[in-house]
Amino acid sequence: MKVKKWLLAIAAFAVIAVMMVLCAVCAGAEAYGNFEYGVLDDGTVEITGYKGSEQKVDVPEKINKKSVTRIGNLAFKNCTKITSIAMPDSVVYIGRSAFYNCTSLKSITIPDGVKEIGYAAFSECAGLVSVKIPDNVTKIGDSAFINCANLTKIDVTAGNKYYSSANGVLFNKNKSEIICYPAGIKNVGYS
């Protein structure tokens, strides 16, 4: 009987602890128009969600006078109406699956400030046709452009020290390794 009461007390404590954590996470999300965001430890902003239905989306450079530096994990997940998105140069990080299943997104120009593109950042973007990757990108996560059925062109600027492109295909800098062979490219072969 004592063991049963002890187990019930532990279970009750665990439920309360989980509820407190969930409330703390929910309390951290703020809204700015259709954007959900959080303020990071360094005082900059991470976009954590989007609730709009616009086709063309402009991510603000600042929210409440704080620079937007990150597009968070899953931030635009399933935003199927977006056809184009503009991000400010202040963005340095695009998170894991940030644009997952944005099926109407046609093209994306990664801002010059971006250093890292997370795992599967643009996965399942069936409408995506082209991507431009700037000089400052040092890391592109695995599967960043997986299942983008119409993707035919990944362009890397000449000044990028880590990546290059040829015929729309994404390579490491010295072209010894294919990083991403776009699904929409037909009749091009590499050996």
Question: Model-found features: residue ranges?
Answer:
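Bacterial N-terminal signal peptides
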Residues: 11-23
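Glycine-rich loops and low-complexity Gly/Arg-rich segments
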Residues: 9, 74, 177-179
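Sec-dependent signal peptide cleavage junction
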Residues: 20-33
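N-terminal secretory signal peptides that target proteins for export/translocation
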Residues: 1-6
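Structural signature of tandem-repeat unit edges
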Residues: 34-43, 52-70, 80-93, 102-116, ...
